[in-house]
């Protein structure tokens, strides 16, 4: 049974519902604006197809709730517990998720714009085919997250820990990933444009067939990684560490490999035409 009329009646009388318990409520299609639910509890609450704007969910508990297909604008989720929440196919604009717990969340096919996820826990979350524009994920945890076919533009992922995450077939444009931990991550068939990976850790990462022309890889650690047939034309690998990397058929045309460490790397059929190999260590 829908609880929409009940919640609307409550917030019309008192828009400040901090600390309330709305667990299990069916709020499908509800439209709320300017309401505060700080420290409130919304366990397993349905807010699918809802329209939410200027809502305060800071430090609220919303575990296992559903915002599927919701339109969410300028909502504050900072320090909230959102474990297991689904935002599948939702549209989120200008939302604040700073320091929130988003483990096992589902953002599949959602559209995120101007959102702040700095310092959030997104372990085991799903961003399958999600569109992310001008968002901040700096220093967030995304261990073993599923980001296959994600489209990311003009966003910050510096210092993120995305060990073991799946970013295969992803498309990134103007993304800052400096100092990111991406050990054993899957970038198979990704397309990176104007991406900065300086000082990132990609030990054991999979970059087979990746399209990364012109990308910044300065001082990156790619030990034991697989770059088979990847395109790094014009990319910057100055001081990069590629010990035992698989570079079979990799295109380094006009790339900067100066001072890079390629000892025991597989260079069979690798293309280094017009590449800068000054002080490159091959053996």
What are these regions (language model features)?
Residues 3-283:
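Tandem repeat scaffolds
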């Amino acid at each position: 049974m829908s609880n929409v009329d009940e919640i609307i009646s409550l917030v019309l009388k008192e828009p400040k519902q901090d600390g309330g318990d709305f667990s299990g409520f069916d709020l499908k299609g509800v439209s709320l604006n300017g309401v505060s639910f700080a420290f409130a509890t919304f366990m397993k609450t349905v807010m699918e197809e809802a329209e939410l704007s200027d809502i305060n969910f800071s430090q609220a508990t919303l575990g296992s709730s559903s915002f599927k297909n919701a339109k969410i604008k300028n909502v504050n989720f900072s320090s909230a517990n959102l474990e297991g929440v689904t935002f599948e196919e939702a549209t989120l604009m200008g939302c604040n998720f700073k320091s929130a717990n988003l483990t096992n969340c589902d953002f599949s096919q959602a559209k995120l714009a101007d959102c702040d996820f700095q310092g959030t826990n997104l372990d085991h979350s799903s961003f399958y085919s999600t569109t992310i524009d001008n968002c901040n994920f700096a220093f967030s945890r995304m261990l073993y997250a599923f980001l296959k076919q994600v489209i990311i533009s003009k966003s910050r992922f510096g210092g993120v820990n995305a060990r073991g995450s799946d970013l295969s077939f992803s498309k990134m444009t103007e993304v800052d990933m400096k100092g990111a931990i991406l050990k054993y991550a899957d970038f198979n068939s990704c397309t990176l444009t104007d991406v900065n990976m300086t000082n990132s850790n990609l030990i054991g990462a999979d970059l087979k067939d990746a399209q990364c022309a012109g990308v910044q890889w300065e001082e990156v650690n790619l030990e034991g990684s697989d770059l088979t047939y990847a395109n790094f034309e014009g990319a910057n690998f100055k001081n990069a560490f590629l010990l035992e990397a698989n570079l079979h058929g990799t295109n380094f045309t006009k790339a900067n490999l100066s001072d890079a460490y390629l000892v025991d790397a597989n260079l069979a059929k690798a293309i280094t035409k017009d590449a800068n190999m000054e002080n490159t260590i091959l053996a």
